Amino acid sequence: SDFYYLTHFPEPEAVVVLVPGREHGEYILFCRERSPEKETWEGRRAGLDGARELYGADDAFPIDDIDEILPGLLENREKVFYSMGRDADFDVHLMGWVNEVRAKARNGVHAPGEFVDLNHMLHEMRLFKGADEIKLMRRAAKISSAAHRRAMQVCRPGKMEYEIEAELWYEFKKGGSQFPAYPAIVGGGANSCILHYNENNA
């Protein structure tokens, strides 16, 4: 959710890089390119132009080119702000890119010497809400409230858990929500005593 908070970019296989003071723009997005064949089956993609035009990226590159481009963005930077440990595979890639930059030390290129945990900084930022965020949160609360009222109205003996869950999701979608902020816990009978029950299949 931190990636979405920073970019509002909804597609998979994407990486955001923020480079303070970069001449060609500070907000860089690596993402999938447009592909008519794949979009026929998987849905539309923003592509590089969409990343810039729709999501405000200063620069956008194909995700397949990240190994060639990202090491250059790390050159002569003192620090890397990153959430280490969240994605083990990406951690390995990042360390590989940093080592690639270190290998250029004889040419006068400096690698970042410090990693700073991004989680703390981002979560601190997210504590403070702007007017637009507050408006959005109020709207989300109204949608959630309507969905829970609907779930309570349809709840009857003999009703299956998944039927009640479906009513909840229906109301979320009807209210304009793209996806739920939390999983549904719909437990009947003995399942109602399980705190984080989410099978919802009885």
What are the functions of these language-model segments?
Residues 1-146:
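A composition/biophysics-driven feature that prefers long, compositionally simple stretches
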Residues 3-4, 69, 173-174, 196-200:
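Generic recognition of flexible, low-complexity loop/linker segments
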Residues 8-10, 192-202:
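Acidic/histidine-enriched ion/cofactor-binding microenvironments in catalytic or ligand-binding pockets
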Residues 37, 88-90, 171, 192-195:
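Flexible loop/turn segments at secondary-structure boundaries
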Residues 126-182:
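Active-site pocket-lining segments that scaffold enzyme catalytic pockets across diverse folds
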Residues 179-192:
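Short, basic/aromatic beta-hairpin or loop at an interaction surface
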